Amino acid sequence: MEEVMISPVEHDPQGQVKQQQAAGVGILLQIMMLVLSFVLGHVLRRHRFHYLPEASGSLLIGLIVGILANISDTETSIRTWFNFHEEFFFLFLLPPIIFQSGFSLQPKPFFSNFGAIVTFAIIGTFVASVVTGGLVYLGGSMYLMYKLPFVECLMFGALISATDPVTVLSIFQDVGTDVNLYALVFGESVLNDAMAISLYRTMSLVNRQSSSGEHFFMVVIRFFETFAGSMSAGVGVGFTSALLFKYAGLDTENLQNLECCLFVLFPYFSYMLAEGVGLSGIVSILFTGIVMKRYTFSNLSEASQSFVSSFFHLISSLAETFTFIYMGFDIAMEQHSWSHVGFILFSILFIGVARAVNVFGCAYLVNLFRQENQKIPMKHQKALWYSGLRGAMAFALALQSLHDLPEGHGQIIFTATTTIVVVTVLLIGGSTGKMLEALEVVGDDLDDSMSEGFEESDHQYVPPPFSIGASSDEDTSSSGSRFKMKLKEFHKTTTSFTALDKNFLTPFFTTNSGDGDGDGE
């Protein structure tokens, strides 16, 4: 006779009540930490206290609550609501963050630096991964640190090369800086995540199969295939949505709810489509965001445009803040391997060296193909090197390594990664403002005379055909607003887009004639 399984919840009503209570307490604590993080972030912004950025504050809140939960011996049923699950991160938290990055992107600064961005993100990340892995293996061979197998060192190099400069970019916007530097840091970080994931998964496959070196040669080819396929999927979904909203006639007052619902579903469809066929959802949803903002957005009614802009900004802010809280709490709750402190210390040193090889080497390569007045200046290279924070992506991959690596090696890598994340987010994130001042790349916070000098310095690097000082609208009180105005001015005047967009794409995919700027702003 077939045995009928009865779940504990059905068998024990009292247990069901306790589980519901634990869920309520866990979710309540999460909401309280979110509220506290947003209030703290508002206070920090209002008082212009850049030594503790919002992301750092959220991480600290998670760490403190996690430590208190450990000390107070919180019930396991409540703790389970705070365990960082990489599947939850990749499927629910990451997509809105990446889509908002593409949706809010000013495309012309991004695409005018696209060659440099791809160089840093693909070649640079590959170089940084190999250099980090090689140095870690060499350090182990010289008995300076715990020795890991070579492939596992490369896995560590791949996951720790995933940058997450959310903190740096927020400070860039607050204090104001060069639009090209902002585009380089932003673009490199987004595409770098896809490269790091691809490298990590490939090395994990090599480690499981313990096979020949042919897989190492296939890493680059596989990434290019993944990148091209993911970009094509994202662009295809974006163009499909543009045609749908152009010809479906949804921009009427009684269909705004349907219009907004469909618009919100397309990004997630793009992400899941790419992940479902073995491509990169990150790259796919990024380009979906770029295409939907430029072509689909203008096909919406004004009310729907206002709603979807606010909605994606809201969801992205919630996901971003929750990720850092989630990560901080889990760091405090997880078991760590502190018996190999040397591995942690040397890893911090090695990723700094690898980041330098990545940035300065790729910048040299990019400058070889640029005119003298368009070369990346050294102060921008230094800022780019300093902006290589590690965050949620590296943490999620390190958490995955606990399952991928046996014999406690994953625990060592996880402990080293969490330490690096905390150190870079708190120390580097908190000192970014001073770094920008020291490198003299601060823009809108300076006085008028220095601002004019900054405008002149822009002509040393992809000279923008605009003059910030010539505007009569500089009475705005917020430096962040002035920075956004500068981005918008750059977006409207630069000539990086070809006539193809104006004469063919915009008229075909939108209700616009293509005679305007087509910003969709």
Curated annotation (Swiss-Prot):
Name used for this protein in its record: Sodium/hydrogen exchanger 5
Subcellular location: Endosome membrane; Golgi apparatus, trans-Golgi network membrane; Golgi apparatus, Golgi stack membrane
Keywords associated with the record: Antiport, Endosome, Glycoprotein, Golgi apparatus, Ion transport, Membrane, Potassium, Potassium transport, Sodium, Sodium transport, Transmembrane, Transmembrane helix, Transport
Reaction(s) the record says it catalyses: Na(+)(in) + H(+)(out) = Na(+)(out) + H(+)(in); K(+)(in) + H(+)(out) = K(+)(out) + H(+)(in)
Species annotation: Arabidopsis thaliana (Mouse-ear cress)
Tissue: Expressed in roots, leaves, stems, flowers and siliques. Detected at low levels in roots and shoots.
UniProt induction comment: Induced by NaCl in a ABA-independent manner.
Known function: Involved in trafficking to the vacuole. Required for cell proliferation and cell expansion, but not for cell differentiation. Acts in low affinity electroneutral exchange of protons for cations such as Na(+) or K(+) across membranes. May also exchange Li(+) and Cs(+) with a lower affinity.
Region (Disordered): 453-480
Principal localisation: membrane
Lumenal topology ranges: 45-48, 137-141, 187-222, 293-310, 362-382, 433-521
Membrane topology term: Multi-pass membrane protein
Intramembrane extents: 87-107, 142-162, 166-186
Cross-referenced InterPro entries: Cation/H_exchanger_CPA1, Cation/H_exchanger_TM, NaH_exchanger
